[in-house]
Amino acid sequence: MASARVRVGREVAGRGGKGVSVISGLPLAGPDLEALASRLKRLCGAGGAVRDGTIEIQGEHRDRLVAELRLLGYDAKRSGG
């Protein structure tokens, strides 16, 4: 795959205190981004969405997401606290 710098962070703002894991920097668009989002949601057993070129997965799943993205060949790093 690509060696793009992919960041996996956590956001709470605007979500009533419920956090989401946010994946940004993916070199994908359209159906490819949707397909990856679907795979990652299934892996985490959680809902989520694709918004403005980022993938949001409900809940705290950063470590699991970083591990899976690295297996897929992305240079994924955990960002934030």
Regions found by a protein language model. Name each.
Residues 1-42, 49-51, 63-81:
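Long, charged, low-complexity intrinsically disordered regions
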Residues 53-58:
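A generic structural motif
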